[in-house]
From Swiss-Prot:
Upper classification of the organism: Bacteria, Bacillati, Bacillota, Bacilli, Bacillales
Entry protein name: L-lactate dehydrogenase 3
InterPro entries: L-lactate/malate_DH (IPR001557), L-lactate_DH (IPR011304), L-lactate_DH_AS (IPR018177), Lactate/malate_DH_C (IPR022383), Lactate/malate_DH_N (IPR001236), Lactate_DH/Glyco_Ohase_4_C (IPR015955), NAD(P)-bd_dom_sf (IPR036291)
Gene Ontology terms for molecular function: L-lactate dehydrogenase activity
Assembly and interaction partners: Homotetramer.
PROSITE patterns: L_LDH
Amino acid sequence: MKRHTRKIAIIGTGLVGSSCAYSIVNQGICEELLLIDINHERAVGEAMDLSHCINFTNTRTKVYAGSYEDCKDMDIVIITAGPAPKPGQSRLDTLGASAKIMESVVGGVMESGFDGIFLLASNPVDIITYQVWKLSGLPRNRVIGTGTSLDSSRLRTILSEMLHVDPRSIHGYSLGEHGDSQMVAWSHVTVGGKPILQILEEQKERFGEIDLDEIVEKTAKAGWEIYKRKGTTYYGIGNSLAYIANSIFNDDHRVIAVSAILDGEYGEYDICTGVPAIITRDGIREIVELNLTEDEESRFAKSNDILRDYMKTIGY
């Protein structure tokens, strides 16, 4: 019986791309891992280094460096290429440079005959995901950004430290921009199935007055707190990429907050933003529409309006 070989390409072997590759190899997510970088020798070096660590894992992944032409048979192409924000910049400030890079990258990949799923981490990820969808001509379910997946993880971590509960027992999502304007759908955050708003109300003596906006800001600024201390972030986003890729290959039907192109969901059209979505082997099977409160709807719409204003600067 012929078995399909799972194949992933990573474009951009900087800290994010190499961290993603390391997660993929350690977890045995695919059988073939192609690395592509504008500095080909760097990609070769990363492939060699990763190949040398495989004997210490329970997996057997073929890792090699190549070019866009090799993307033809890939199931997933992960793009991490792009400039890192400089001190004082937001992710949105890198848009112009990132957009130019995507024109070259997507053109090269599509010329190979690629017909799989794009998975994006390049910032600003929501707008870049939209651009890649437009440039590639692929169906919207097969162009996915990491969106607020990492933000949602950071939110759960912050809440777990506050509540002294395992973060895996906390469910909730950051929505909107992967950036400063993101919001949290507090009406849908639960701890062991119990609404967090109810918990905070019932246990005021224990927790005191909790400023929810402060938690949202702490979540949104978490990346910058890391940046101030070590210069950049890569483990969290690298593992997020690997997690989404694994969910695709395993047809998990797992709900993950990703950058998705909306076409009527949440009353929004022609925009890519962070929302919970069901991830399957075909990419996004369905966008999960949370029943937001009036205040949450307003905050979500405001975040999307900010994204739209920046989209106009690159012609969308």
